[in-house]
C-alpha cells in the first residue's frame, strides 16, 4: 500500500545502570555494531525522512560514535518517562507525516515487521506492536473491549484482573504527526511512577473514536530489550543463530553453526566451507570453494576462488586472488594483496605488500611496504626493514628472485629479476638482475675452544 511520509523517533536517553558500564547502554555492541546503530539502520532502510534521536546520558559519546548525517539530536535533560521523551521531539514533527517510535536498546527489530506495522496503521489511528507472553509480569497490558484496543495499563498501575492479561505492549507504535503532538500535550504524570507515559495516548485516541490496530512481530526476539549484559549476550546468540541458519540454507557449510560469528555482511560463492570459531567482520567476500580453518578472523577482505585459509589466521583489509593458501598463524594486515597461487605460511605478517603469482613466503617473515614479483621464494626469517624511525620506505623485488633465509632488506631497495640473495644477507643497496648478493662475514673456526664455566 502507499504510505505517508514518515519520520522515526529513537529513544536512547537511558543511562543503563544495570550494564555497570561507563558507556551509554545503547552503544554496547551486538554483532560488532552498537545496538542503537541497528535501529538507525532499520529506520533508514524503511525510508525515514528524518531520524530524531532522543539522548540524555553520555551524549558526547553517542555523538562521537554515531556519524549518521540523517540524525536529528534531541536532548532529554531529565528522564521523566517515554511520553516526556517524545514531547522533546514533538516540535520537529510535521503534521502530515507519520511518526514511528522505536527504542535504541531493542536492536533486533526487523524492517519487515516495521513495514507491516506501517501498512496496518489506520487513517487517523494508531498502529501498535504487541506480543502475547506466558508470563507478562512487569509489562504494560493491552486492554480491549469487544476485541478493540482501548488502552495500555502499566503493570504497577494495573488491577489484579488486568494483570491476568497476556497481551503486552512492546512500546513500538506509529501515528500521524499532528495527532501525536495533540495527544502528547495532554499527557499527565498522575501514576505510580510519576512519569509521562507514551502509552496513555492509546486511551486518548480511543476516547476520540480513533482506531488502534495491533500487529505482532514475526519473532519475539525482535522486541526484546536489553537492560543488562546477560540479556545482550542472549540476543547476540539469537542473532548469530539466525545468520548461521541463513548461510547454511544458502549453501555455506558451517561446521558448527553455534561457533560462528558474523559481525557484518558476507557475500559468498558455492561450496564454501567454514570451520569452528571463525569470525567474519565488516564486508567480506568469499569466492567459490573457499575453505577457512578454525579460529580465523576475516575482516573487510576479498578472498578469491579456491583459496584456503588455515587455522588461526587473521586477514584484514586484504585482497586474495584465486588459489592462494594462507597460514596457519599468518597475519595479513591492511593493504596486503596476493595474486593467483601465492602462498603465505605460518607466522608470516604482511602489511601494504603485494605478492605476485606463485610467490611463496613460507614462514617466520615480515613483509611491509613491499612489491614482490611472480615466482619469488622468500626464505624463513626474511624481514623488509621499512621504517627508519620516522618514515616508511618501499622494497621492490622482481620476478623469479630467490631470497635466502634470515635476509634483511633495508628499504628503499630494489632486487632485480632473477637475482639470488644468500642466506644471512643484509641488503642495503640495489641488486642487479640475475646477480648474487651476499654480505656474510667470513666464517672462522677456533679449535679446542672452551665455553665459559660458571663460578661456584
Curated annotation (Swiss-Prot):
Catalytic activity: alpha-D-glucosamine 1-phosphate + acetyl-CoA = N-acetyl-alpha-D-glucosamine 1-phosphate + CoA + H(+); N-acetyl-alpha-D-glucosamine 1-phosphate + UTP + H(+) = UDP-N-acetyl-alpha-D-glucosamine + diphosphate
Organism of origin: Shigella flexneri
Region (N-acetyltransferase): 251-456
Alphabetic keyword roster: Acyltransferase, Cell shape, Cell wall biogenesis/degradation, Cytoplasm, Magnesium, Metal-binding, Multifunctional enzyme, Nucleotidyltransferase, Peptidoglycan synthesis, Repeat, Transferase
Positions contributing to UDP-N-acetyl-alpha-D-glucosamine binding: 11-14, 25, 76, 81-82, 103-105, 140, 154, 169, 227, 333, 351, 366, 377
Name the record gives this protein: Bifunctional protein GlmU
Annotated positions binding acetyl-CoA: 380, 386-387, 405, 423, 440
Pfam families according to UniProt: Hexapep, NTP_transf_3
Cofactor(s) annotated in UniProt: Mg(2+)
Signal sequence annotation: none
An example Gene Ontology CC term for this record: cytoplasm
PANTHER family: BIFUNCTIONAL PROTEIN GLMU (PTHR43584:SF3), NUCLEOTIDYL TRANSFERASE (PTHR43584)
Record's subunit section: Homotrimer.
